[in-house]
UniProtKB/Swiss-Prot annotation:
Subcellular location: Nucleus
Protein name listed in UniProt: Homeobox protein HMX3
Compositionally biased tracts (Basic and acidic residues): 130-140, 149-173, 210-223
Residues bearing the modification Phosphoserine: 153, 180
Organism listed in the record: Mus musculus
Upper taxonomic lineage: Eukaryota, Metazoa, Chordata, Craniata, Vertebrata
């Protein structure tokens, strides 16, 4: 067997040349777009989710099989896509916080506003929670037959259910709206009469409506009470005849009054009223005269002082004093040695003389 040549042995024993080593591939950043979209590749594949619980049991086995097939198809789609819908919640998205004061109404305004305007309540953390009474009223509004036309008006909300008027959680604006609507209804009921000629029964139930009716009827009755009295003007001959009759008789009988009215061309009522006024005037005159007499009598009761004005032998005393002879002193003719007080002015001031 011939030995192989040096060329053949050299080529057979020499190792094959190796290619130059390639540089390592650059490591992808965990914040790359593909990683953010596809999620983490090292996570195990998601487990198939159990079928959702239904509130009502399926009507047949075919419905149950269809629900299971739908759940399996959903799990397969999620596995093929490489990420589950539940992983979306694990992604860290940047959070933007916007101050609520710039885009929201003030809290006190929203709290006071009626439910049909803003059906949410403000929480201390700034969240918005649906108001229970607003949701109930919205359902009542949608179910009411008038919801198609008056959907934007507050009247269906306030008049949909009378039981909701007793809720304590109502805002002041809703209460004011209800009161105004009821008052308008009352006024309309008072103004519009019924088919039988009577007003609406609701207006007569409250005492306020009775007061309103009394006030409405009073202007019609007041003109009747405020009739202008006609003043009768008597002629001189009529006044003279009436005065002469009054001097003879203060009160007339019906027959006398009728005869006097016929003679003077007056009515019996005019004659009767004239005699009433004349009697009142006569009574006033009597009272004035009596008062004047009482005043004069009271003035006469005043005490009058009467001094001593005359002595009997005043002339003889004067002559004796001139001659210088003593004259026997005698008492004066007046019975009172001192001034006397008389109680009546009729008494004359002449001194009372004593007979000798």
């Amino acid at each position: 067997m011939p030995e192989p040549g040096p060329d053949a042995s050299g080529t057979a024993s020499a190792p094959p040349p190796q290619p130059p080593p390639q540089p390592p591939a650059p490591k992808e950043s965990p914040f790359s777009i593909r990683n953010l979209l596809n999620g983490d590749h090292h996570r195990p594949p998601p487990k198939p989710q159990p079928p959702p619980r239904t509130l009502f049991a399926p009507a047949s086995a075919a419905a149950a099989a269809a629900a299971a097939a739908a759940a399996a198809a959903k799990g397969a789609l999620e596995g093929a896509a490489g990420f589950a819908l539940s992983q979306v919640g694990d992604l860290a998205f940047p959070r933007f916080e916007i101050p609520a004061q710039r885009f929201a109404l003030p809290a006190h305004y929203l709290e006071r506003s009626p439910a049909w305007w803003y059906p949410y309540t403000l929480t201390p953390a700034g969240g918005h929670l649906p108001r229970p009474e607003a949701s109930e009223k919205a359902l009542l509004r949608d179910s009411s037959p008038a919801s198609g036309t008056d959907r934007d008006s507050p009247e269906p909300l306030l008049k949909a259910d009378p039981d909701h008027k007793e809720l304590d959680s109502k805002s002041p604006d809703e209460i004011i709206l209800e009161e105004s609507d009821s008052e308008e209804g009352k006024k309309e009921g008072e103004a519009v009469p019924g088919a039988a000629g009577t007003t609406v029964g609701a207006t007569t139930a409250t005492p306020g409506s009775e007061d309103w009716k009394a006030g409405a009827e009073s202007p019609e009755k007041k003109p009747a009470c405020r009739k202008k009295k006609t003043r009768t003007v008597f002629s001189r001959s009529q006044v003279f005849q009436l005065e002469s009759t009054f001097d003879m008789k203060r009160y007339l009988s019906s027959s006398e009054r009728a005869g006097l009215a016929a003679s003077l061309h007056l009515t019996e009522t005019q004659v009767k009223i004239w005699f009433q006024n004349r009697r009142n005037k006569w009574k006033r005159q009597l009272a004035a005269e009596l008062e004047a007499a009482n005043l004069s009598h009271a003035a006469a009761q005043r005490i009058v002082r009467v001094p001593i004005l005359y002595h009997e032998n005043s002339a003889a005393e004067g002559a004796a004093a001139a001659a210088g002879a003593p004259v026997p002193v005698s008492q004066p003719l007046l019975t009172f040695p001192h001034p006397v007080y008389y109680s009546h002015p009729v008494v004359s001031s002449v001194p009372l003389l004593r007979p000798v």
